[in-house]
Amino acid sequence: MSVQVAAPGSAGLGPERLSPEELVRQTRQVVQGLEALRAEHHGLVGHLAEALAGQGPVTGLEMLEEKQQVVSHSLEAIELGLGEAQVLLALSAHVGALEAEKQRLRSQARRLAQENVWLREELEETQRRLRASEEAVAQLEEEKRHLEFLGQLRQYDPPAESQQSESPPRRDSLASLFPSEEEERKGPEAAGAAAAQQGGYEIPARLRTLHNLVIQYAGQGRYEVAVPLCRQALEDLERSSGHCHPDVATMLNILALVYRDQNKYKEATDLLHDALQIREQTLGPEHPAVAATLNNLAVLYGKRGRYREAEPLCQRALEIREKVLGADHPDVAKQLNNLALLCQNQGKFEDVERHYARALSIYEALGGPHDPNVAKTKNNLASAYLKQNKYQQAEELYKEILHKEDLPAPLGAPNTGTAGDAEQALRRSSSLSKIRESIRRGSEKLVSRLRGEGAAGAAGMKRAMSLNTLNVDAPRALGTQFPSWHLDKAPRTLSASTHDLSPH
């Protein structure tokens, strides 16, 4: 038996399409009505049975039996309707469960699709990193071969240079950029130099011991001792002399150096700005100490890659030193070197060549063509030429350095000089060994770049090969120059390393 359910008030308008939720709700209402009707029919059946049991006449009995049959048929129809309604409700619940499962599966499919996209992206990133790692490994293997070759060349270096290379002094990791004022005055003998100058301002006697201790601790890497020592001394000075005092500026300068050695360039820069302000107020804007602080600030900005901000500071330091010390003073030449390096990192090569040329003329006028500073400046100028692809000019400078610079006498050569001459030669050997190592790297870069030019650079390659015989068979005595055949026919050649000589 089927049951047709119509919405209330829709009589005569035909059946109306109901939503699944409304259909289920009305079906439940029908079930409740049928259950009530079934209970009522059960009551009628009971009353009819009682009436039949007590009825006497035959005609009345037949009527009651007929009523009982009608009620029984109605009760069966009600039972059938209830069964169909229960089936409909169960079917609705099942359909609802299937729909929920369908939605869950759709959601899971969307999530899996998104995860698949993520996994694909992760796989691509992993493959990219793998390729980069393989390229890095190949580059490192090539660099390792170059370093092994250069290590084999070191056995031909003079003994004095070898000993120095085994125990090099501790330097700043970015000292290849350019030295600050204090770096040039600081060394193993600093503890014994009681009147050492720091940035053009003489360290007071009461601060010299503290300064030497801080330099010693910083040189040993014991910054946990050096920094509190500086801060305690700074607090004592500020309590006794006030903040705006030259001694406070000096201590700020020392603490800035310690921070710089720890690569804490921002903290060091803030301290130097404070020291600069104090020195300008107490010593005047054109004092050499102000110029030194400006130079140190320029160095820190340069090491942080902020060359545009460093250049005006370096330019102002140069102007002060020219006015106070004269245009031909060695400190002016040092400042010109620093300014040239800053310009080089900004691509201002015309200014670079002009500054180096002026510094070179100052060094040659003061110390002659054999002054180590002359070779150092020429080496820097050659590096600038390399950056401009001026290989011929760079080659000529390297040749000039190699031909003009004296080298230490080889092991076993007769010693005819006095003790003072030997000490001077030792100091000169130490300086030249550093210059020689710098020239070695520059010539490697020159050879590497010329090789990269292919056939067009074949002529330049022949010129460059005359530079790849550094440190071979030193002359018998100091002052002897390299003969030209020695540069052209030496069996040892430098590796075409990709190491960049230029400052970073």
From Swiss-Prot:
TPR repeat spans: 207-240, 249-282, 291-324, 333-366, 375-408
GO biological process, one term: sperm mitochondrial sheath assembly
Transmembrane segments: none
A GO term, aspect molecular function: kinesin binding
Sequence positions bearing Phosphoserine: S173, S466, S502
Keyword Cytoplasm tagged: yes
GO cellular component, one term: kinesin complex
Domain of life of the native organism: Eukaryota
Biased composition (Low complexity): 158-167
Coiled coil, from the record: 90-150
Sorted UniProt keywords: Coiled coil, Cytoplasm, Cytoskeleton, Differentiation, Microtubule, Mitochondrion, Motor protein, Phosphoprotein, Repeat, Spermatogenesis, TPR repeat
Modified positions (Phosphothreonine) in chain numbering: T498
Region feature (Disordered): 153-197, 411-438
Keyword Cell inner membrane recorded: no
Annotated localization: Cytoplasm, Cytoskeleton; Mitochondrion
Main location group: cytoplasm
Membership in a protein family: Belongs to the kinesin light chain family.
Assembly with partners or alone: Oligomer composed of two heavy chains and two light chains. Associates with microtubulin in an ATP-dependent manner. Interacts with KIF5C. Interacts with ODF1. Interacts with LRGUK. Interacts with VDAC2.
Main function: Kinesin is a microtubule-associated force-producing protein that may play a role in organelle transport. Plays a role during spermiogenesis in the development of the sperm tail midpiece and in the normal function of spermatozoa. May play a role in the formation of the mitochondrial sheath formation in the developing spermatid midpiece.
Entry comment, domain topic: The heptad repeat (HR) motif is sufficient for interaction with kinesin heavy (KHL) chains and ODF1. The TPR region is involved in mitochondrial binding.
Entry protein name: Kinesin light chain 3
